[in-house]
Amino acid sequence: MSDQQLDQHELQQEENKLIAQRKEKLAAVREARAIAFPNDFRRDAYFADLQKQYADKTKEELEAAAIPVKVAGRIMLNRGSFIVLQDSSERLQVYVNRKTLPEETLAEIKTWDLGDIIGAEGVLARSGKGDLYVDMTSVRLLTKSLRPLPDKHHGLTDTEQRYRQRYVDLMVNEETRHTFRVRSQVIAHIRRFLSERGFLEVETPMLQTIPGGAAAKPFETHHNALDMAMFLRIAPELYLKRLVVGGFEKVFEINRNFRNEGVSTRHNPEFTMLEFYQAYADYEDNMDLTEELFRELAQAVLGTTDVPYGDKVFHFGEPFVRLSVFDSILKYNPEISAADLNDVEKARAIAKKAGAKVLGHEGLGKLQVMIFEELVEHKLEQPHFITRYPFEVSPLARRNDEDPSVTDRFELFIGGREIANAYSELNDAEDQAERFMLQVKEKDAGDDEAMHYDADFINALEYGMPPTAGEGIGIDRLVMLLTNSPSIRDVILFPHMRPQA
């Protein structure tokens, strides 16, 4: 057994010992009272609200006012005379007043452990150092914790353990709690932003008979009652556009997508996406709307449009760069010429050399995108709208009027990561049917991510869809930026993990 394994074994033995001791204490609680886990305590204040409301009250003013409060929280520190509690908002001290608390309560307090949850009544007071606290007149145990909190000196520092036991991570790491509060703020702000502009929030199917709306490999399941194969959705796009056909001219959805692909710092098989569609608009309108949204989000969450991330700062207050796929390759790779990019064989050779997985049947447009992904994408630090994607890789986007080989599409990159994907929607039913057939050929040639043919969607387009622009924004990656989080797992409460050995 290695030294590390020995240390782990000793730690586990110590933890088991502590758990056994706590179970003995719980047994004593069960014996002493009829209800070991009471549910009749009602608090009337959160710690953060108390700190804010009484911030300007002096020690003498609080003493004269004798403000009664009922608070509850988890014991994070026990200093004898003072117990530090934590609720969902903040930490606050409660004072173990030996003059006012009964002897039996004082004796019970000595048996409590870190992690236990208590409810306390008392009056607000301020210490000589200026700290607000509750001078307890009564207190009782609400929940006995059977497992010890992580060591107070080291905390929960193992990254994988933080992801696997997020409930412990949230207990002991304020930074984690802050991240998920910000995530909630971001989603709430997006909803408000779109609702104020006339968008209707909708819900579309998570289980679909035909996975569509993105180039991705789906999760497959089986509907027993209907005896049919179904798929977890990879995107809501085709259903949202059906709603535009039906007359809802501005719609959005914030919900989960599922893609049966790899796990990395940027990818989780289950992730949250915002998709929105607006009739009588194009992809340039969406660029303007996206810039406005991102600036508002940064200002609301950070109080500034300068977004720190690692050792960089992204400037959301400045105009986002707008550059085509073709021009971006030339700009960031001066050794590549326009003639090279317009020659299939030369483009294939460049893509192979760059490390792209070239199968041999790709057209020029797809090869150009492969080159972009390998040689340009990671260099796009400040916000970039990359536009005019080839139609081969944009089966749902409208062709550009001046150059039909490309589409009216953009992807937004920040910090070398794709954050959003948008385009003027293809509303020509015949063109869409042809592109679906091209995707079917790609799938038959071995491309697992190529789209299926969706006859009902073609049927919907044949009724007529107004000129429309649509966009998808990855909520998880956006929250990563706004919370300075290096991994997507840091912003998903319960990320997918490999089984433990």
UniProtKB/Swiss-Prot annotation:
It is found in: Cytoplasm. Keywords: Aminoacyl-tRNA synthetase, ATP-binding, Cytoplasm, Ligase, Magnesium, Metal-binding, Nucleotide-binding, Protein biosynthesis. Mg(2+) 2 binds at residue 418. GO terms for cellular component: cytosol. Its main location: cytoplasm. Its EC number is 6.1.1.6. Binds 3 Mg(2+) ions per subunit. It comes from the Bacteria. InterPro entries: Aa-tRNA-synt_II (IPR004364), aa-tRNA-synth_II (IPR006195), aa-tRNA-synth_II/BPL/LPL (IPR045864), Lys-tRNA-ligase_II (IPR002313), Lys-tRNA-ligase_II_N (IPR044136), Lys-tRNA-synth_II_C (IPR018149), NA-bd_OB-fold (IPR012340), NA-bd_OB_tRNA (IPR004365). Mg(2+) 1 binds at residues 411, 418. One of its GO terms (biological process) is lysyl-tRNA aminoacylation. The keyword Cell division does not apply. Its cofactor is Mg(2+). Disulfide bonds: none annotated. GO terms for molecular function: ATP binding; lysine-tRNA ligase activity; magnesium ion binding; tRNA binding. It catalyses: tRNA(Lys) + L-lysine + ATP = L-lysyl-tRNA(Lys) + AMP + diphosphate. Belongs to the class-II aminoacyl-tRNA synthetase family. Homodimer. This is Lysine--tRNA ligase. It comes from Pseudomonas aeruginosa (strain UCBPP-PA14).
